[in-house]
From Swiss-Prot:
<dbReference type="InterPro" id="IPR050072">
    <property type="entry name" value="Peptidase_M20A"/>
</dbReference>
<keyword id="KW-0220">Diaminopimelate biosynthesis</keyword>
<keyword id="KW-0170">Cobalt</keyword>
<dbReference type="GO" id="GO:0008270">
    <property type="term" value="F:zinc ion binding"/>
</dbReference>
<protein>
    <recommendedName>
        <fullName>Succinyl-diaminopimelate desuccinylase</fullName>
        <ecNumber>3.5.1.18</ecNumber>
    </recommendedName>
</protein>
<dbReference type="InterPro" id="IPR005941">
    <property type="entry name" value="DapE_proteobac"/>
</dbReference>
<keyword id="KW-0028">Amino-acid biosynthesis</keyword>
<feature type="binding site">
    <location>
        <position position="73"/>
    </location>
    <ligand>
        <name>Zn(2+) 1</name>
    </ligand>
</feature>
<dbReference type="InterPro" id="IPR011650">
    <property type="entry name" value="Peptidase_M20_dimer"/>
</dbReference>
<dbReference type="Pfam" id="PF07687">
    <property type="entry name" value="M20_dimer"/>
</dbReference>
<keyword id="KW-0862">Zinc</keyword>
<comment type="pathway">
    <text>Amino-acid biosynthesis; L-lysine biosynthesis via DAP pathway; LL-2,6-diaminopimelate from (S)-tetrahydrodipicolinate (succinylase route): step 3/3.</text>
</comment>
<feature type="binding site">
    <location>
        <position position="107"/>
    </location>
    <ligand>
        <name>Zn(2+) 2</name>
    </ligand>
</feature>
<feature type="binding site">
    <location>
        <position position="142"/>
    </location>
    <ligand>
        <name>Zn(2+) 2</name>
    </ligand>
</feature>
<dbReference type="InterPro" id="IPR001261">
    <property type="entry name" value="ArgE/DapE_CS"/>
</dbReference>
<dbReference type="GO" id="GO:0019877">
    <property type="term" value="P:diaminopimelate biosynthetic process"/>
</dbReference>
<dbReference type="GO" id="GO:0009089">
    <property type="term" value="P:lysine biosynthetic process via diaminopimelate"/>
</dbReference>
């Protein structure tokens, strides 16, 4: 295993960013490095620190044409047990197999480096390009995500900022870089359900009301329900119970209440209001004394074939020789906030096989491939 030397500009920058321990919401000066580079390339910089989160918006070009934005996050998830890593997770080493190892290599400091180097090259090659190249970067994607991209998008919307196309650098690829891009994501609707009973002694059930016995049939019906059939772009909406708690810990006490935590990952065939109404109808049918706290993490979004998806797909083809697959699978991303502006959003990044894991790693050479794909996309849309 050797430390990276004589590397491409993209790999040099990726290693610099990985060496900065930017666990959510700490940025560890990753954005300062990026802004300095972008400023030197002629970008107009707008730092936006919101509460404890660092963000920035940067633009290069004119306001009378289309805007292509690169979006991403400098924060990473915790490393887990450091002793289980093959190297220090913030050392950014390239091993004997050519793998770049470190927290954030895939998710998503590698993408940030590729985006930035591609943009530097593009504005140098095409100083009078059409429209604008933009960057929207945050240090709060892996955490609560209240003061990151969501808050920046709200500010951009308030001042009617134009944003036609957006490439989010999330690690979309599965086996080979560019084999999959995300052209949408399911919505995420969470809930905490409380079913109230009456606490009592297990030997005197007639004096109590067991919320477990009452709630289980309703939960079973919710789990068996077919919420929709999906469509050409999305699988059917799914319902999953993630936590179920009741009882005092004593073996002779009927609990007074039951708490169930569940989540919908829903397609564009369902609405938040529709799902909530159907849940309420099932709970009422079982005559439960219930209360639900709902938490919407994001609405579903979809970018159908058009200028952005066509440019990304053809760039992948020209650089790698491979056809890409557009998919809406997986969890949520900050693309859900950007899509509210009416923006076409595509996620394209490295292979995601080891994200959030111990020994997170990607093939180092993939970042140079990704840089070229980003560059070719810029050329197709703005040159």
């Amino acid at each position: 295993m050797t430390a990276p030397t004589d590397l491409s500009p993209t790999l040099q920058l990726a290693c610099d960013l990985i060496r900065r321990p930017s666990v959510t919401p700490v940025d560890a000066d990753c954005q300062a490095v990026m802004m300095q580079r972008l400023g030197n390339a002629g970008f107009k910089l707008e730092p936006m620190r919101i509460e404890d989160v660092d963000n920035f918006w940067a633009t290069h070009g004119t306001t009378d044409g289309p805007v292509l934005c690169f979006a991403g996050h400098t924060d990473v998830v915790p490393t887990g047990p450091v002793e289980n890593w093959q190297n220090d997770p913030f050392d950014a080493l390239i091993d004997e197999h050519g793998m770049l190892c470190g927290r954030g290599a895939a998710d998503m400091k590698g993408s940030l480096a590729a985006m930035l180097v591609a943009a530097e090259r593009f504005v140098a090659d095409h100083p009078n390009h059409k429209g604008s190249v933009a960057f929207l970067i945050t240090s709060d994607e892996e955490g609560p995500a209240h003061h990151g991209t969501k808050a920046v998008v709200e500010r951009l919307a308030a001042r009617k900022e134009r944003l036609d196309w957006c490439i989010v650098g999330e690690p979309s690829s599965t086996t080979l870089v560019g084999d999959v891009v995300k052209n949408g994501r399911r919505g995420s609707l969470g809930a905490t359900l409380t079913v109230r009973g009456k606490q009592g002694h297990v030997a005197y059930p007639h004096l109590a009301k067991n919320p477990i016995h009452l709630a289980v049939p309703a939960l079973a019906e919710l789990a068996a329900e077919h919420w929709d059939h999906g469509n050409d772009f999305f699988p059917p909406t799914s319902f999953q119970i993630s936590n179920l708690n009741a009882g005092t810990g004593a073996t002779n006490v009927i609990p007074g209440d039951l708490v169930a935590v569940f989540n919908f990952r829903f397609s564009t065939e369902s609405t938040v209001e529709g799902l909530q109404q159907r849940v309420a109808a099932i709970l009422d049918k079982h005559e439960l004394d219930w209360h639900v706290n709902w938490a919407l993490s994001g609405l579903p979004f979809l970018t159908e074939p058009g200028a952005l998806l066509d440019a990304v797909s053809s760039s992948i083809k020209s650089v790698t020789g491979r056809d890409t697959k557009a998919s809406t699978s997986g969890g949520t991303s900050d693309g859900r906030f950007i899509a509210t502006l009416g923006t076409q959003v595509v996620e394209l990044g490295p292979v995601n096989a080891t994200i959030h894991q111990v020994n997170e790693r990607i093939l180092a050479s993939d970042l140079d491939v990704l840089t070229e794909i980003y560059y070719q996309t810029l050329v197709k849309l703005l040159a």
